[in-house]
Each structure stands twice: as C-alpha cells, then as structure tokens.
C-alpha cells in the first residue's frame, strides 16, 4: 500500500521503535495517529491517550479509532517477561496477554467495519521470532506472540476478497529498553544477534508498502522458524545450552 496520504494508527507510537516509525511514515507522506499511554512529543500528529493494559482504555481507544477510520493499523506496543513461569505474578501474566494479544484483537475489531465499507485497509501485527520459536523463560511472551501470529493468519483468511491486507512481522531481538539487564546478559552470553530499531522500522514500512503477508527478520532465525515447524525436537537440542544459561542467570546468587 502506498503510504502517501494514508492515516496510520500506531500503538506504542511514543516508544523506541514506535517513535521512529511515526517519523518514518510521516516522511513518506502519511498522517500518523499516535496511540500511547505516554505523552506524545510531537503535537502536530493526532494523539490518542490510553493504557493498553486497561480494558476500559482499550474500549475507548477502539471507539476513537472507529471515528478516525485509519487506512492502516499497526499493532506495535508490547511488553516482555524473562523469568520462570512459576515466579511470574498472575497480575503480570494477565497484563502481558492483555497488551500483547487482547488489545491488538480488540483494536483490529474496531477498525474493520470502516475498512470493509471502504474496500481497503491494512492490519499490521508486530510479533516476534519467539512466536514461532518459543523460548524457555519467555513462556508467556512467546505464547502471546504465537497467538498474535495465529490471529494474523486466521484473520487474513477471513478477510479474503475484502480488499483488506493482514501483515505479520516477526523481528528477532531488537536493541530497545524492553530488554532489561538480565535479558541483555543473556544476549551477551549466548551471542544473540540484536538488530537496531532503525532496521526494524525500515522493514515494517517496506512490508506495508509491498502488502507483505509474513515477514521474519534475521538470519539464521528465519530458517529456524521453518525447522521448528517441521522438526521441533531438533530445535530443542539446539536451544538446550541457551536454556541452561538463562536458568543460571535467573538463579539468585548467594
């Protein structure tokens, strides 16, 4: 889809990747609509304030989006948890699924009627390689992103012949504040490749412009996605060392 003249709603539009994406699409001639719980630094763009972890806020944001009728919705906002499932607070589990999966579904639902009436539109869901290669100690994050991947695939099939495209983009690790000190320690000890936010933003914009279906960013991670789908036990073995390193990082030092 040509970005010029298009209204693009972006959740997490004031974050590290979101802020860069807002500026990138604006330079392409699009009109960004920023959705964030943080104040928007640039007042010249339309701004919707709301916390995606709050279901009432999500409902209110959805109503505003229904009125704005964006051409493109980018579900970018997300949170991460690195740790053992048995130690993750239930409130944090609920919040993670709410932000990473439920909010994208509800906001998509809110914009679909206007897109169907117009006969065009695009839903862009930003997932993760972890959604296709679930990692130990990222259980809720991996499963939420796997859910977003399945949502994208099912919705794409449902919207056949409507003129609405659904794009799923799965980056590998990215250098952003979402990664806490322990995640960065894991990345260093396992030699995990991490991309700069600018590269991810360029790939997102390119995927939108080319109406891409599924985009997996990074090599060899994109190959492992296919291997894991066919031979998951092979990937189990390949990740065993990393899993042990993660467990050691998470073990309190006496």
Q: PLM ranges: what are they?
A:
Residues 84-85, 89-94:
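Substrate-binding pocket helix/loop in short-chain dehydrogenase/reductase
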Residues 128:
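Residue(s) in the substrate-gating loop at a strand-loop-helix junction
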Residues 76-81:
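Conserved NAD(P)H cofactor-binding loop of Rossmann-fold oxidoreductase domains
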Residues 168, 188-225:
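C-terminal helical subdomain
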Residues 14, 18-22:
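N-terminal Rossmann NAD(P)H-binding glycine-rich loop of SDR-like oxidoreductase domains
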Residues 42-56:
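Rossmann-fold cofactor-recognition segment
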Residues 108, 144:
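Active-site helix of classical SDR
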